[in-house]
Amino acid sequence: MGMSKSIKVILSLALVVFLALAATKVEATRYITYPAIDRGDHAVHCDKAHPNTCKKKEANPYQRGCEKINRCRGG
């Protein structure tokens, strides 16, 4: 029931590699840095000299809801 020496060596090396990978610090941050926020804050054709081109359009413009007297939702 004894394992051969080569299998023991392979398992030992695999364990060392696994522990080395598990001990490394992951470089992912849990917060957004200021340069990342600044890069994503401008429109595609935004020009610093002409700031009016930097204004974004409203995604969902306001529309009044349906009034009860109009019966636009089935009653």
Curated annotation (Swiss-Prot):
Protein name per UniProt: Protein RALF-like 9
Cell compartment(s), UniProt: Secreted
Signal peptide: 1-28
PANTHER family: PROTEIN RALF-LIKE 15-RELATED
Stated family: Belongs to the plant rapid alkalinization factor (RALF) family.
Domain of life of the organism encoding this protein: Eukaryota
Organism, as annotated: Arabidopsis thaliana
InterPro entries: RALF
Function recorded in the entry: Cell signaling peptide that may regulate plant stress, growth, and development. Mediates a rapid alkalinization of extracellular space by mediating a transient increase in the cytoplasmic Ca(2+) concentration leading to a calcium-dependent signaling events through a cell surface receptor and a concomitant activation of some intracellular mitogen-activated protein kinases.
GO BP term (any one): cell-cell signaling
Sorted UniProt keywords: Disulfide bond, Hormone, Secreted, Signal
Major site of localization recorded for this protein: secreted
GO cellular component: apoplast
One Pfam family cited in the UniProt record for this chain: RALF
GO molecular function: hormone activity
